[in-house]
Amino acid sequence: GGFYWMTNRAGSIKIDAKILYGHSFAIYSLSEYTLATGDIRGIEYAEKIFDLIQKYCADTHFGGYFEMFERNWKLKGHGAAGGDRKTLDVHMHLMEAFTTLYECSGKEVHRRKLVEIIALIIDKILHPEFRTGIPQFFADWKIAPQIKFDIIWGWDRFSEDGSKGQAEDNTSYGHNVEFAWLLMYALDLLNLPLKKYINIIQKQYDHALAHGIDWEYGGVFVEGSHAGGV
């Protein structure tokens, strides 16, 4: 079950791995398809993917989700293979996917998993002082130096040899603002009070405005230190 990571335009499989990042967008897009068209096949497939994720990806010991798997859902190896890492990027987009899934299905299990992942991101993934996103963790949620995975979708964040400057102190300005927006959307859908989270959201926006904007040439820097700077 699930989706291959990559095919060519003719449909031939190029990379047969099962990557949680891709499955989060499958849930999101299929749920949105049903919301837009009324065609129930979208939500039916989205729920099947959700069930696969809970079966194969959920870490029932430390919480959160593993992210990188072989075709048969065997967890990939350590290091660049990504099997021992958990990331803000994937968990943020799972939150986004669970939001739209719950919006479409209205099922309690989808609401519960959405509430759980919001709490996990805030408690484990955001910096305790600056409330900015920490990119990578080991399975037990100890902060991990940011490395380049074998399968990746953000090539601009690393040098050609895969190294990362300030690998233990960097945060993505774009991800922080994106998370804040997605969180507000999820809270509205869940009918939960924004007041409880407004300080976190405000810190993330203020941090991005103060340190992430290139006021000289325009645009947004990719990332910088949690304390500020590029």
Q: Residue spans of the language-model regions?
A:
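Glycan-recognition and catalytic cores of secretory/periplasmic carbohydrate-active enzymes
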Residues: 1-230
